[in-house]
Design a protein with these regions (language model features):
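Catalytic-loop region of hydrolases
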Residues: 27-75, 79, 83-89, 376
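N-terminal cap/lid subdomain of alpha/beta-hydrolase-fold enzymes
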Residues: 60-134
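Conserved acidic catalytic loop of the alpha/beta-hydrolase fold
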Residues: 139-144, 151-170
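Conserved hydrolase catalytic core segment
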Residues: 168-207
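Alpha/beta-hydrolase-fold enzymes
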Residues: 192-277
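Short beta-strand/loop motif that positions the catalytic acidic residue
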Residues: 306, 312-314
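Conserved alpha/beta-hydrolase "acid-adjacent" motif
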Residues: 319-325
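Catalytic active-site module of serine/aspartate enzymes centered on a nucleophile-bearing elbow/loop
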Residues: 336-376
Length: 376
């Protein structure tokens, strides 16, 4: 395993909101008010050989870990989204992206399962990333942030789980880039889980280095880019907002907002508002670091290492990972000796279907999770 920790890891807690008291009521099926915590470890060795002197991983948890440490589920998130996947961070805050799937009595049942939702290494929601302070300079890593891989992201999560006392996972589950992580878990730590739920995703990245160059070229259109050293020059929010608008439209946001905003101009204004909010948080260099990791990702070549059962889920209207790729992926899983099932979400919400149309695939997920629990 490509990590080295010369000093004892530290688990820190950063509360974003007070937790519900033991006697406080919450909506049926909800995990209630949640908080982000932070795990910190030292001297984390990356697959490429570089060492992060200090690494932080932000995460949320839902449910309670069993004494034997074997009732856990790991949730993995998408490329530009966060680890907030269930409950709310404040009473009036937004629900987590998989709130319809995670909670008491839901498909991923927190009455029985301990769920860990990890912000991936390199992301902009609390984990170590290019915007983090480089101990050597006291300034953000920026473009000097070392290349990371899906193996590094998974091994960082494994270090987190070890610190929490998790001995075995019932399943790993996640959408999009989270599906990449799910497949990578299956080949990097094949004995550590009983189920893999890869959603609107694939076992191999696409686009190649040309996709990385294209991304950098887009970011460089902002006059503050400065080769990626924009932190003291006002940032690159303008170009990030424009890019986010385009991304949201690829994800199917027009269809999502059509009922609430039937007027096209009002809908466009809402999309831009959401894009502007995102661009105040997400770092351009994180986009580059994660894009590099994604185009180099390839769990397909190591599929024969997988031991867990796979549930592969796509969305009927997804333009990023269309259902047309399913036969090839399923054939390769079968050829590698992997037991796998396929499910297609009949949704108009494209790449966002797994959360927005949770009810349309929750029964299938619940059945799969019940089987994985029995195997655990």
């Amino acid at each position: 395993m490509s990590r080295s920790m010369s000093r004892r890891p530290v688990v820190a807690s950063l509360a974003l909101a007070p937790m519900l008291g033991a006697g406080a009521a919450h909506a049926e099926g909800s995990v209630g008010i949640v908080e982000t915590r932070k795990f910190v470890t030292r001297d984390f060795k990356l697959q490429g050989g570089a060492v992060l002197p200090e690494m932080t991983i932000a995460y949320e948890t839902y449910g309670k870990l069993a004494p034997d440490g074997r009732n856990a589920v790991l949730l993995t998130h998408g490329f530009t989204s966060s680890h907030h996947m269930a409950g709310r961070t404040t009473a009036n805050g937004a629900e987590g992206s998989w709130d319809g799937l995670v909670g008491p009595g839901k498909a991923i049942d927190t009455d029985r399962l301990y769920v860990v939702s990890s912000n991936m290494l390199g992301s902009s929601y609390g984990s170590t990333s290019p915007a983090s302070k480089n101990p050597a300079t006291g300034k953000p890593y920026g473009p000097d942030f070392p290349d990371i891989s899906l193996v590094d992201i998974v091994n960082a999560q494994k270090a987190l789980l070890d610190s929490l006392g998790v001995k075995h996972l019932v399943a790993v589950a996640g959408p999009s880039f989270g599906g990449y992580q799910t497949f990578q878990w299956g080949v990097t730590h094949p004995d550590f889980m009983d189920g893999l739920v890869a959603v609107v995703s694939a076992p191999k990245g696409s686009g190649g280095e040309a996709a990385v160059k294209s991304l950098i070229d887009q970011l460089a259109k902002d006059p503050n880019w400065n080769g990626g050293w924009y932190y003291d020059k006002g940032g690159i929010q303008t170009v990030l907002t424009d890019m986010r608008v385009a991304t949201l439209k690829r994800y199917g946001i027009d269809e999502q907002l059509a009922a609430k905003f039937p007027d096209k101009a009002a809908r466009e204004a809402e999309i831009r508002k959401r894009a502007e909010s995102w661009s105040t948080v997400f770092d351009g260099n994180s986009l580059v670091a994660l894009r590099k990791a994604s185009v180099r990702f390839d769990a397909e070549k190591d599929m024969a290492k997988m031991k867990a059962k796979v549930l592969y889920v796509l969305s009927r209207t997804d333009k990023l990972f269309p259902p047309s790729i399913a036969p090839d992926v399923m054939a390769k899983l079968k050829a590698a000796g992997v037991t796998a099932d396929y499910f297609e979400i009949d949704s108009d919400f494209g790449h966002s279907a797994s959360g927005l149309d949770a009810a349309k695939w929750a029964p299938r997920l619940k059945t799969f999770m019940a089987g994985a629990e029995k195997r655990s």
